[in-house]
Amino acid sequence: MKTPRFSKKASSLSLGFAAITSLSISVVAGAYAAADEKEVIATPYQIISTAPDSEWRQLDPENTLVLDLPSGEIIIELRPDIAPLHVERIKTLVRQGFYNGLKFHRVIEGFVAQGGDPKGDGTGGSELPNLEPEFFLDTQALGEFTVVGRDRMASRIGFAKGVPMAAEPESLRSFRADKRVLAWTTHCPGVMSMARAAAPNSANSQFFLMIGDARSSLDQRYTAWGLIVDGYENARRINRGEPPDRPTPVIRMRIAADMPVDERPRVEMLQTDGDTFPRYLERAGLVTDGFVKDICNIKAPRRVKGKIEL
């Protein structure tokens, strides 16, 4: 029996078919590999959810303010590193029960909700002396200031433990007699600031919380002393008006350290000086090539009772 022989033409066809098949397999495999690569690109939420515990910090109960409104709680982190005199004043008045029952007398949509006046008309205050302004501070006085880029209003934009801030160029230090380079809190939604009259040193007890972006009108003119870290939706429910027809009252204000341990807020903030935060900003498209699109659209992620909030 003769062994069948294949012609050279048939052999060439077979080899060609094998090559095409091999190429097809390679293309398909490459496509699957590309798909796999796309699948492993983490979303902003995945980046935050996989951040190690070492990159989260718990709020200090002594510098955590709980503001109770009819709509619910607002949790505020006080920042004595940014405005020590104003934080001390707020804590003193809170512990006196001064704010309990007072109403928000001036609430402007897209701007501020102002309260803390016992007269309810914007002319009152406490019996304590007025405060000197703390509109800005030297960047070197900040324990942490992480620059994430620049924007249309400031050469340096960043965060100090979650608080949005702007600053002058560091290069100015060598040209100034006092060797200071200034940083200030940006008046973005959620920032807590102190109201005053025309005189810079007239702040006393009245405060306002930001419900809009007012950087151009308030930055470096008013002292910011805290940041809402949870419950901002309740701030949005404060009745509008100058004054409102039905002013929203402060039910009570408390310092978390004065509350029973099991009633204290459970809020953690992502460290803005860690490795995770810049990755999150880039992946979310909030900072591109060193340009910050809108600092007021960025907030440090939180974990509230273990649940992540972006």
For the regions a language model picked out, list residue spans one by one.
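Cyclophilin-like peptidyl-prolyl cis-trans isomerases
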Residues: K2, G30-L310
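N-terminal secretory signal peptides that target proteins for export/translocation
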Residues: M1-A10
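Bacterial N-terminal signal peptides
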Residues: S14-S26
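A periodicity- and composition-biased signal for non-globular, repetitive helical segments
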Residues: K8, S14-L15, G120
